[in-house]
């Protein structure tokens, strides 16, 4: 099956053609980073307008790079949520138009589900597995028993990890996207220079909290303004170390509690070099089978949307033309989709 997938949940306009939910024939991404960098973060209205400007181009390029026309496409998958409502609607509208015009089946896909399954585009992972989804809007731990079968084990109670990276970066004068800037500076810094707190590390749950850590950085900079200049590398490394330690140890606790020794780490923050290293060291020391997609598949893309899209379309699970954006869409609710179909 050839699936044309579209993604427009935040600030990346993307389209991809994927065969049988595993082989990427094309993956085109139009980034808006340079546009939003001026504002220090994503501006929803601007994001929607940029999606409108780019969506036709990325679809055309995806088809051209794959060497196929719309007449060869068997189905269309589109990110339905979670994300920015206006941004989501751009991709959804185009997907509906293509599906209607070509009489193709259409299915709305959960963006986070796409992240968790992106790894299947590079190597198969056996179910069940524990998954850590870390991005600008999410820091969640899941038990994954199959496509469409997810159990939330823990989640952020305030800021997501990616959000914390961006806010701290802005606080210390670094450009957007903050995670990339902090990762780059941290390479030359001492992660033990500043002892920042590790929120909720020993609370007995699998939940996360990064708001207090952000406040701790603000307090430190207020007391030591020189940290934003001469000590900025140490500051970046120390903050990053705190985030990575919490993410790794909470994930390790979930693995230990469930006894499932297969782990997937996904989402934009999974591009972070320190987090990848921390997870790899933990997995190697504890006999855990670790899978982290390549950075291109950790960042927002449409190829990952085709993985669950292909599966649902193959089952005959489709969406009607009343498909609407779901800015909030918990993964746990996806099981209802399969139950209703069966």
UniProtKB/Swiss-Prot annotation:
Disulfide bonds: none annotated. SUPFAM superfamilies: Actin-like ATPase domain (SSF53067). Substrate binds at residues 133-137, 166, 179, 183, 272. It is found in: Cytoplasm. Keywords: Acyltransferase, Cytoplasm, Iron, Metal-binding, Transferase, tRNA processing. Belongs to the KAE1 / TsaD family. This is tRNA N6-adenosine threonylcarbamoyltransferase. It comes from Geobacter sp. (strain M21). The gene is tsaD.
């Amino acid at each position: 099956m050839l699936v044309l997938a579209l993604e427009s949940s935040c600030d990346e306009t993307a389209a991809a053609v994927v065969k049988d939910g595993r082989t990427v024939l094309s993956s085109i991404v139009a980034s808006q980073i340079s546009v939003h960098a001026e504002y220090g973060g994503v501006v929803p209205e601007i994001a929607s307008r940029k999606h409108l400007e780019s969506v036709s181009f990325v679809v055309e390029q995806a088809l051209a790079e794959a060497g196929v026309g719309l007449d060869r496409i068997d189905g269309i998958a589109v990110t339905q949520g979670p994300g920015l409502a206006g941004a989501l609607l751009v991709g959804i509208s185009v997907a509906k138009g293509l599906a209607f015009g070509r009489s193709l089946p259409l299915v709305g896909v959960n963006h986070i589900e796409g992240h968790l399954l992106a790894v299947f585009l590079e190597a198969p992972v056996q179910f069940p597995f524990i998954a850590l989804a870390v991005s600008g809007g999410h820091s969640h731990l899941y038990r994954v028993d199959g496509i469409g079968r997810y159990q939330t084990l823990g989640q952020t109670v305030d800021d997501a990890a990616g959000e914390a990276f961006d806010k701290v970066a802005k606080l210390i004068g670094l450009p957007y996207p903050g995670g990339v800037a902090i990762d780059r500076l941290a390479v030359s810094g001492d992660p033990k220079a500043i002892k920042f707190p590790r929120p909720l590390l020993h609370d007995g749950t699998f939940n996360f909290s990064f708001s207090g850590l952000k406040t701790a950085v603000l307090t430190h900079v207020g007391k030591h303004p020189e940290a934003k200049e001469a000590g900025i590398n140490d500051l970046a490394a120390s903050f990053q170390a705190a985030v990575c330690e919490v993410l790794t140890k909470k994930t390790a606790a979930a693995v230990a509690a469930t006894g499932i020794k297969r782990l997937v780490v996904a989402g934009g923050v999974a591009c972070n070099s320190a987090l990848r290293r921390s997870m790899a060291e933990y997995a190697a020391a504890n006999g855990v089978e670790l899978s982290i997609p390549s950075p291109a598949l950790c960042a927002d893309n449409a190829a990952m949307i085709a993985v669950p899209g292909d599966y649902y379309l193959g089952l005959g699970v489709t969406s009607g033309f009343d498909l609407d954006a779901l800015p909030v869409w918990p993964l746990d609710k996806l099981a209802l989709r399969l139950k209703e179909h069966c």
